[in-house]
């Protein structure tokens, strides 16, 4: 069996189609002076062909995925046609007498390597996008064949060293049942696209292309993160049964789509979705989300060469507001920094970026960024039920300063005659121990809290969740973390406010009953987790959950706490 990184869930059965292109061989010989013009023309001609191909892919991506994914390929075209890139390549041809392919390879590889050296995991994975563009350019310069994935005629499971975003956008979805790659990560554009399409995918296997041949029969189990190669009939029958069970469970859960998240004894909470773009709203609605508990606006700031303008942001926020209709959308202001840097911003080199210049600290230092974003959100609030949420808050002073800024921008919009929601709600992320311990004071300043358990856990336990050596210490169900969460919920309720949660813990089935019993008002998670969490809530009594929470929070260790929770779940047969 083969395993890797589970990129998109599902189970598929089919023959393997191994994607292998002609090897790109770079001609590194020195050219003569009278060959320079010819090589420059080879580069420009190859670039023109590559740009035309990307225009076609961009159009198809827009039709299949929506405007946000179309914008990815608009970015690819912009990079390919970038004047500085052109000048660098032509300079190498003219000054160093390099061939067109050698010059293009050196410049593109230099850009990709620079991205890989960054600490930011997201930007590291953008190196694959740059190499995707470079590979297409080189194949056109060299006159090599480019595989047309949209022309696949048989039902297959794709096996490749890697699938680039442009290749993924070309997939014939009636024929491609899923894909497996040697490389890739869960946050790559390819993985994100697979989830958008609900196409089973496992990436980062390391060696699937060396273990699979064309026409091998595969079972892609992207539920348990396993790939079976030429399995026995017994294994096939067993996995068919698993597939039927998964499909049956999915169908049963789908029946809950339009039902409220209400317990057997009548206590109701909200189950919402975390989104990154307007395209995600469709999946949220399909899975029964009752709103958007976290709209991550930082994706608007990524995959581009400059900060988005107020108008660009307004268009994006308006699209989400209109797509969600009467449902509330919590718009988190830009959460950049930490593990998410922007190549066009001058980030300082920091010993610990998670404790440094990030999120609201950047916005308060760079008021023009804050102004553009808040004005855009306010203007979009005229088209739906938007709420504003600030990340990385540690003090009441910050909240008061931010509210003053909002009032300034509101007055600007009034003076300009631009509509907005005068009573728009303002909330904060509680993701630092500082915010949690002064929650009783913060609750007087805002309309709601949303607990970010990923960072709250990391900061409370002093554990870098990206450090494999101590990752076992990262325990969101630690009594210390859970008692802080309870303190925050109680503080908000004492002021007549509500508390939601948008961290990974909100979608953790083992934590649902505990959080419910602690009084959490809103659970926000990946859309795909919503049906199962809603089922758990609808199958329990709120009073039982409160008893569980009281007992669990009194436990001294995580193991004892989890033993209690697991016993309760088994006895109630809830999950």
Swiss-Prot record:
Activity regulation text: Inhibited by oxalate.
Pfam family membership, one: PEP-utilisers_N
Residues reported in the UniProt entry to bind phosphoenolpyruvate: 296, 332, 454-455, 465
One GO molecular-function entry: metal ion binding
Phosphotyrosine modification, residue list: 122
EC number: 2.7.3.9
Superkingdom of origin: Bacteria
Binding site for Mg(2+): 431, 455
First-tier enzyme category under EC: transferase
PTM section of the record: Phosphorylated on Tyr-122. Phosphorylation on Tyr-122 is important for polar localization but not for interaction with TmaR and for activity.
One Gene Ontology biological process: phosphoenolpyruvate-dependent sugar phosphotransferase system
UniProt keyword terms in alphabetical order: Cytoplasm, Kinase, Magnesium, Metal-binding, Phosphoprotein, Phosphotransferase system, Sugar transport, Transferase, Transport
Catalysed conversion reaction: L-histidyl-[protein] + phosphoenolpyruvate = N(pros)-phospho-L-histidyl-[protein] + pyruvate
Any single GO CC term annotated in Swiss-Prot or TrEMBL for this entry: cytosol
Active site: 189, 502
Entries under Gene3D superfamilies matching the protein: Phosphoenolpyruvate-binding domains (3.20.20.60), Phosphohistidine domain (3.50.30.10), PtsI, HPr-binding domain (1.10.274.10)
Primary location recorded for the protein, binned into one broad class: cytoplasm
Cofactor: Mg(2+)
Function: General (non sugar-specific) component of the phosphoenolpyruvate-dependent sugar phosphotransferase system (sugar PTS). This major carbohydrate active-transport system catalyzes the phosphorylation of incoming sugar substrates concomitantly with their translocation across the cell membrane. Enzyme I transfers the phosphoryl group from phosphoenolpyruvate (PEP) to the phosphoryl carrier protein (HPr). Can also use (Z)-3-fluoro-PEP (ZFPEP), (Z)-3-methyl-PEP (ZMePEP), (Z)-3-chloro-PEP (ZClPEP) and (E)-3-chloro-PEP (EClPEP) as alternative phosphoryl donors.
Family membership noted in the UniProt record: Belongs to the PEP-utilizing enzyme family.
Record's miscellaneous remark: The reaction takes place in three steps, mediated by a phosphocarrier histidine residue located on the surface of the central domain. The two first partial reactions are catalyzed at an active site located on the N-terminal domain, and the third partial reaction is catalyzed at an active site located on the C-terminal domain. For catalytic turnover, the central domain swivels from the concave surface of the N-terminal domain to that of the C-terminal domain. Enzyme I of the sugar PTS has been shown to phosphorylate NPr of the nitrogen-metabolic PTS, though much less efficiently than it does HPr. This process may link carbon and nitrogen assimilation.
Domain notes: The N-terminal domain contains the HPr binding site, the central domain the pyrophosphate/phosphate carrier histidine, and the C-terminal domain the pyruvate binding site.
Protein name: Phosphoenolpyruvate-protein phosphotransferase
């Amino acid at each position: 069996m083969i395993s890797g990184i589970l990129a998109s869930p599902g189970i598929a059965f089919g023959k393997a189609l191994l994607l292998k292109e002609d090897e790109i061989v770079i001609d590194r010989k020195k050219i003569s002076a009278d060959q320079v013009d010819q090589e420059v023309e080879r580069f420009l001609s190859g670039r023109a062909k590559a740009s035309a191909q990307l225009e076609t892919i961009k159009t198809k991506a827009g039709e299949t995925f929506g405007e946000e994914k179309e914008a990815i390929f608009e970015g690819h075209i912009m990079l390919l046609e970038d004047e500085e890139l052109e000048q660098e390549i032509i300079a190498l041809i003219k000054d160093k007498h390099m061939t067109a392919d050698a010059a293009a390879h050196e410049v593109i590889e230099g850009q990709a390597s620079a991205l890989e050296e960054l600490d930011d995991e997201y930007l590291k994975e953008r190196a694959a996008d740059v190499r995707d563009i470079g590979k297409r350019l080189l194949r056109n310069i060299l006159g090599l064949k480019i595989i047309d994935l949209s022309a696949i005629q048989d039902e297959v499971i794709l096996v490749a060293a890697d699938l680039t975003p442009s290749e993924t956008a070309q997939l014939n979805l009636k024929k491609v049942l899923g894909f497996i790659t040697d490389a890739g990560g869960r946050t790559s554009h390819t993985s994100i696209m697979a989830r958008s399409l609900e196409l089973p995918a496992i990436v980062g296997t390391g060696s699937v292309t060396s273990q699979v041949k064309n026409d091998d029969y595969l079972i892609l189990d992207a539920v348990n993160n396993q790939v079976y190669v030429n399995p026995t009939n017994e294994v096939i029958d067993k996995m068919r049964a698993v597939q039927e069970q998964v499909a049956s469970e999915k169908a049963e859960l789908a029946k809950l789509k339009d039902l409220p998240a209400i317990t057997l004894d009548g206590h109701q909470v909200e189950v919402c979705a975390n989104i990154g773009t307007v395209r995600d709203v469709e999946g949220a609605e399909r899975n029964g989300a009752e709103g958007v508990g976290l709209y991550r606006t930082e994706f608007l700031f990524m995959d581009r060469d400059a900060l988005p303008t107020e108008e660009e942001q307004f268009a994006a926020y308006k699209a989400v507001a209109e797509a969600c209709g009467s449902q509330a959308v919590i718009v988190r202001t830009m959460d950049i920094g930490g593990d998410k840097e922007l190549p066009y911003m001058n980030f300082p080199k920091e010993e610990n970026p998670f404790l440094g210049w990030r999120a609201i600290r950047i916005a308060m230092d760079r008021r023009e960024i804050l102004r553009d974003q808040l004005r855009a959100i306010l203007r979009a609030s005229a088209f739906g039920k938007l709420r504003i949420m600030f990340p990385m808050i540690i003090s009441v002073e910050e909240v008061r300063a931010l509210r003053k800024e909002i009032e300034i921008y509101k007055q600007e919009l009034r003076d300009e005659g631009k509509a907005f929601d005068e009573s728009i709600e303002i909330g904060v992320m509680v993701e630092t121990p500082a915010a949690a311990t002064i929650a009783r004071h913060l609750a007087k300043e805002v309309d709601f809290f949303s607990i970010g358990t990923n960072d709250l856990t990391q900061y409370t336990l002093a554990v870098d969740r990206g450090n494999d050596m101590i990752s076992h210490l990262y325990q969101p169900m630690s009594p210390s973390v859970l008692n802080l969460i309870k303190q925050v919920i109680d503080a908000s309720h004492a002021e007549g406010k509500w508390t939601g949660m948008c961290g990974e813990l909100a979608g953790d089935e083992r934590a649902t009953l505990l959080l419910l019993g602690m009084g959490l008002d809103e659970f926000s998670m990946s859309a795909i987790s919503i049906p199962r969490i809603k089922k758990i809530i609808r199958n329990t009594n709120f009073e039982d959950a409160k008893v569980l929470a009281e007992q669990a929070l009194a436990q001294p260790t995580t193991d004892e706490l989890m033993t209690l929770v697991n016993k309760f779940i088994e006895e109630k047969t809830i999950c």
